[in-house]
Amino acid sequence: MLKTCRGFSLFMNWFNGICAVVCGGWMMLSALVDLPLSWNDWMPLSIYDPFPFHDVFFTSHFWPGLALLLVNGVSNVVALVLRRKGEAEWHRACLVAGILLLCWTITELLIIPNGMSLFYFVLGILQTAAAAVLMKNAVRRTA
């Protein structure tokens, strides 16, 4: 069980760290320059219409891309870096990354429900649960 939790946590750190940084960066770049394959080709800006302040923060994909990069990308990259510092720091960072993913996807599911957000919501539950199991085991070992 612990090996599975460690493996899944590590997978999520790499997967979300890479995907959120790449996709967030692509979204931001698509807002700034004309790309041959732009984020605008995948997702129209009208998808943001249900969000509060959509006419301020969602006039391009820049701010959503920056938020994705910072919230989901950086939190998982930090967790990967902290893995070298020690298990306790890594477990806490994995828990924070999982909770942030849950908050992100819950917001998306409430405002713009879609299958991809549901998929990431399940991943967020699993990431948070895996980190909680690892933290509980670490506390048990030190007690």
Model-assigned labels for residue ranges:
Residues 1-143:
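Topology signature of small-to-medium multi-pass alpha-helical membrane proteins
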